[in-house]
Regions:
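Acidic-and-aromatic substrate-binding clefts and catalytic sites of carbohydrate-active enzymes
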Residues: 74-80
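Short strand-loop junctions, especially beta-strand C-caps/beta-turns
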Residues: 73-74, 103
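Beta-rich, aromatic/charged-enriched effector core domains that present basic-aromatic interfaces
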Residues: 83-164
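Well-ordered alpha-helical segments embedded in enzymatic catalytic cores
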Residues: 53-56, 81-85
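Catalytic cores of large soluble enzymes that bind and process phosphate-bearing ligands
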Residues: 46-49, 53, 78, 104, ...
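Surface-exposed, flexible loop/turn segments at secondary-structure boundaries
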Residues: 13, 36, 76, 106, ...
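N-terminal beta-strand-loop-alpha-helix module at the start
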Residues: 1-73
Length: 164
């Protein structure tokens, strides 16, 4: 099944399980977008550093024989909008399945949830694998408890991960 996988600019993890195997059926995508540079004022050096890291990571992915589509800020196909870029690639490459890693930013999380609901193809989310905890660990830990003391959560995490 032809799959499109989105990599966001803060998910540059070459050790992610996605990259353990190469497949002709998987296409990765990354986008430099005005949507991300303009929603909050950023120093130009921060934006340049962010895009430089993304470009370097994209070269690593290609060097490891993964298919990747990368839209630079001035790419003629870049719609400057995440949903529009994804929709373009889904149509252009006859994608049957879409996957993405859970974003750390609420705004992007909501945008991707809405986008996936609008799709006529299947979709799936993955953990970013760069944190000790998963998205719902804190909520699950405190479920049914009357006291919400972070120290107890941290102690539990240290035991689980054998730290200290």
């Amino acid at each position: 099944m032809k799959t499109l996988r989105l990599i966001l600019g803060d998910q540059l993890n070459s050790k992610h399980s996605w990259f353990k195997e190469q497949s002709e059926e998987v296409i990765y995508c990354m986008f430099e977008m005005r949507q991300e540079t303009d929603h909050v004022t950023h120093h130009i050096q921060k934006i340049i550093g962010f895009f430089a890291a993304m470009r370097d990571f994209s070269e690593q992915i290609k060097a490891n024989n993964h298919k990747l589509i990368y839209f630079t800020l001035d790419d003629k196909n870049n719609k400057q909008d995440l949903a529009e870029n994804l929709q373009f690639l889904i149509k252009e490459h006859k994608i049957k399945h879409f996957e993405y890693q859970l974003p750390d930013e609420y705004r992007l999380d909501q945008q991707l949830i809405k986008f996936c609901k609008s799709l006529e193809i299947s979709s799936k989310t993955y953990d970013t694998e760069h944190f000790y905890t998963k998205r719902n660990d804190l909520k699950d830990f405190f479920k049914g408890k009357k006291q919400f003391l972070m120290e107890s959560f941290y102690r539990d995490m240290r035991k689980k991960h054998d730290i200290l």
